[in-house]
Amino acid sequence: VFIAGDAAHLMPPFMGQGMCAGIRDVSNLSWKIIHCVKKTHNEKILNSFQKERFSNVKEYIETTMKMGEFINAMRSYKISNTISDQSNGSKTMKSIKPELGPGLGSTLDKNRGRIFPKFNISKSKSFDELFSFEPILIVSKKLKLKKMSNKIKIVKESSYKELTKILKKFNADAILVRPDRFILQTF
């Protein structure tokens, strides 16, 4: 039995992240369950769910609680470390992008567990929509791949100009992206 979303963690309402966290929970679980049903992965892969999602959701909950303090105008000194001054004098909250906790992939890879950037490939379609719930391997122009498994989609850097920037951002020649769009490994 797996518990996901608000059944697993009650999210304060201030950032609208309760349903988002639930969707990320289900996204994390669904591709793993699909592979277990198809017998392409051992059921032990499901053990990574709680480890991976805990720290990610925890950071959202903590930030949402700080946002609640801000919204409720509680003592401003409590939240001063989460607010930054802008050049125009306005104040903004720092954005968060929590990584997955330990689970699948090498924890020695500093990019493992980070969310893969989203970008549009046309006015009406995003890169994510092209590869729904499929693992993808993004490879740079430098790499010459021979035959790979047909279970993973290979996307060449030259296919989309945005991939050049992304490979550079992660200092990688290849990025293995999980079906839930978190980075499994960079090479």
For each predicted feature, which ranges?
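Helical substrate-recognition/capping region of FAD-dependent monooxygenase/halogenase enzymes
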Residues: H35-F187
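Active-site-proximal cofactor/substrate-binding loop regions of enzyme domains
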Residues: V1-N47
